[in-house]
Amino acid sequence: EFRTGEVNRVKECTYTPGGKGLNVSKPAAIAGAEVVATGFIGGHAGSYIEEALKPLGIRSAFYRVAGESRSCINIWDKKNQKQTEFLEPGFTVSEEDFSGFEKHFKELVKQADIVEISGSVPRGLDGTAYQRLVRIVKENGKKVILDTSGKLLTMGIEACPTMIKPNGDEIKMLTGRKVNRMED
């Protein structure tokens, strides 16, 4: 049982590389797809992520920046069946960093069949970040799936991704309608 304001003795800890993009990459690699993971990475946590992906069969092609990749602490309270997350802010990416990443990304896209762009972006980037990346993929004649939310999703859609993967909240944001069933 997780108790706030007290010392909590932990019985089990696991460390796994995560984030929306890597959570898509893992089952794809298990299913036999050749997967290349990219994005921004930094510091000791970034090095850990790269090493932890190797045994999963995921090729690491991250773009290194100054700072430390963020960590997420996820506490699972078995007794109450509740999850609590603590998300670090992570590093800030400059426009110069993003321009360098775009060049790196263009080279990776040339080797890809399908590109998934997902999750959030680091501080310092605006809502056009995924729009710019979707355009790069489309300019190379490749398929692109966009799985994000908020301004990144609305602006990303303007670049015409092949597919989007919105959840119920994102569908409501896009259409103004609440979705309760597949028929909606």
What annotation goes with each model-predicted range?
Residues 34-61:
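A glycine-rich beta-to-alpha transition motif near the start of alpha/beta enzyme domains, typified by
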Residues 1-38, 47-48:
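Glycine-rich phosphate/adenosyl-contacting loop at the front of the ribokinase-like
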Residues 75-111:
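Conserved phosphate-binding/catalytic loop of the ribokinase/pfkB sugar-kinase fold
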Residues 63-71, 92-97:
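Gly/Ser-rich phosphate-binding catalytic loop and adjacent alpha/beta segment
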Residues 127-184:
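Conserved phosphate/ATP/ADP-binding segment of small-molecule kinases
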Residues 29, 54, 138:
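Anion (oxyanion) recognition and catalysis
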Residues 40-43, 65, 78, 120, ...:
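Cofactor-binding loop segments of dinucleotide-utilizing enzymes, especially the Rossmann-like FAD-
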Residues 112-124:
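Short acidic, glycine-rich surface-loop motifs adjacent to enzyme active sites
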